[in-house]
Amino acid sequence: MADQPQETTDFGFRTVARDEKQAMVADVFHSVAAKYDVMNDLMSFGIHRIWKRFTIDCSGVRRGQRVLDLAGGTGDLAAKFSRMVGEQGQVVLADINDSMLKMGREKLRDRGIIGNVNYVQANAEALPFPDNYFDCITISFGLRNVTDKDKALRSMFRVLKPGGRLLVLEFSKPLLAPLSKAYDAYSFHVLPKIGELVVKDPESYRYLAESIRMHPDQETLKGMMGAAGFDNVTYFNLTGGIVALHRGFKF
């Protein structure tokens, strides 16, 4: 009997076995974790802070609520949510990568944020939380690294409370051709050089550029969220569509 063909997925522009991608992505983030915040500021000229602020403003989070910051990395969103939910609320900073989770924990504790934030190493495709548990879920620059995005979106839908909302902040497709060309030149020629200088790892930032190009565009991701069960899915193009914030509700 012939062997079954192996399922594949993308890792940047490469095609790899589905069961290998998770480990390959993990290697990338183990490599860059220590300089992740510095690189974010350098790569985006600090604009990532504005994108994240807009995400916070669209969250509708209130005191006493429960928030999941998925692929939360070094905790930029979790820190702000911690103040918003107050002592009676809860923020769960979850990341599949233990190096990133460690950096987030250390960063928030150094800032005195300790009372209402929990840290969980979790795979977005199989979230270890009860049904209807969170009032709000955010995933910031993480969905494109997930192997099975549809499965992850369904998992997020399951753990979100009725009336809750999901916010997906992610790189997307620039709206104008000249901007797209300039962005490509920057991504494929400048980013790897910055990665080499700061992290000594140009390949991880070459993967970053490639993973952005392979990520679903605005309308495709909107359709995926709808297929996962989310209602009233909309998106906001930021910085000319270089980044988009998708928002969907569970009713």
From Swiss-Prot:
| SUPFAM superfamilies linked to this entry | S-adenosyl-L-methionine-dependent methyltransferases
Question: What EC number(s) would the UniProt record show?
Answer: 2.1.1.163, 2.1.1.201
Please cite one Gene Ontology biological process associated with this protein: menaquinone biosynthetic process
Signal peptide residues on this chain, from the entry's feature table: none
As for family, the record states: Belongs to the class I-like SAM-binding methyltransferase superfamily. MenG/UbiE family.
Tell me, in a sentence or two, what this protein's role is: Methyltransferase required for the conversion of demethylmenaquinol (DMKH2) to menaquinol (MKH2) and the conversion of 2-polyprenyl-6-methoxy-1,4-benzoquinol (DDMQH2) to 2-polyprenyl-3-methyl-6-methoxy-1,4-benzoquinol (DMQH2).
Name it.
Ubiquinone/menaquinone biosynthesis C-methyltransferase UbiE
Q: Which gene encodes it?
A: ubiE
